[in-house]
Regions:
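Structural motif corresponding to the early beta-alpha repeats
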Residues: 1-52
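Active-site beta-loop-alpha junctions enriched in small/polar residues
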Residues: 23-25, 47-49, 75-79, 98-101, ...
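Hydrophobic, well-structured mid-protein blocks that either form specific transmembrane helices
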Residues: 30-84
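Alpha-helix-loop-beta-strand connector modules within alpha/beta enzyme cores
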Residues: 1-20, 58-78, 112-136, 170-174
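Catalytic cores of alpha/beta
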Residues: 26-36, 79-92, 136-152, 166-168
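Glycine-enriched alpha-helix->loop->beta-strand junction motifs that scaffold or abut catalytic
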Residues: 14-15, 35-42, 63-71, 90-100, ...
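Glycine-rich phosphate-binding active-site loops on the catalytic face of alpha/beta enzymes
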Residues: 42-51, 96-107, 147-168
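Glycine/Thr-rich beta-alpha phosphate-binding loop at enzyme active sites
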Residues: 78, 84-125, 166-170
């Protein structure tokens, strides 16, 4: 409650950049609550958005103060037609493509079909930042970097490693 009332920040506020991956149906309606928590990035999952017709208007209407304080991204699942995000690219800071179908599951195998979606997106919008989350390990990460991915999001490949810091360094070297 103190965080929502802006009397204090998130734990480790100054040490960690928080990213909110909003796989919830009320993300747009509660956006002001999420912004009060001070994330560096907010990601809306397109498949969870109830009112897609007005979603672009919502993104365009985010004020410049909020835009300066955080990055706004839109995520799509591997089986979603990548062209569905084309109308949203101009009002987002990045697009996140999920690398797995079972979102939220650790250790899932990367869906190789995602590479074609990335190529299509980069051909149409070469300047857009692309992030991939799910199934990202050093092998898939290398392939993703080859097709133009800017950010890799990895959980189990890092946290299951015996040397977590060493694994992070390996990812940074990709």
């Amino acid at each position: 409650l103190n965080i929502l009332n802006e009397r204090e920040g998130m734990p480790f506020w100054e040490d960690i950049d928080f990213e909110f991956d909003l796989m919830v149906s009320d993300a747009v309606e509660n956006f002001d609550i999420y912004t009060k928590l001070g994330p560096k990035r907010v990601i809306f999952h397109l498949e969870a958005i109830k009112d897609r017709e007005n979603f672009r208007e919502f993104l365009e209407g985010i004020d410049s103060y909020t835009r300066d304080a955080m990055e706004i991204g839109v995520a799509i699942n591997p089986d979603t037609n990548v062209e569905e995000v084309f109308p949203l690219v101009s009002c987002t800071d990045f697009i996140q493509i999920m690398g797995i179908s079972h979102i939220g599951m650790q250790g899932e195998e990367f869906n190789i079909d995602v590479l074609e979606n990335i190529k299509t997106l980069k051909e149409k919008f070469p300047e857009i930042i692309i992030s991939v989350d799910g199934g990202v390990n050093l092998t898939s990460g290398e392939k993703l970097k080859e097709v133009g991915v800017d950010r890799l999001v990895s959980g189990s490949a890092i946290f299951s490693a015996s040397d977590i810091i060493g694994k992070i360094e390996e990812f940074r070297e990709l």
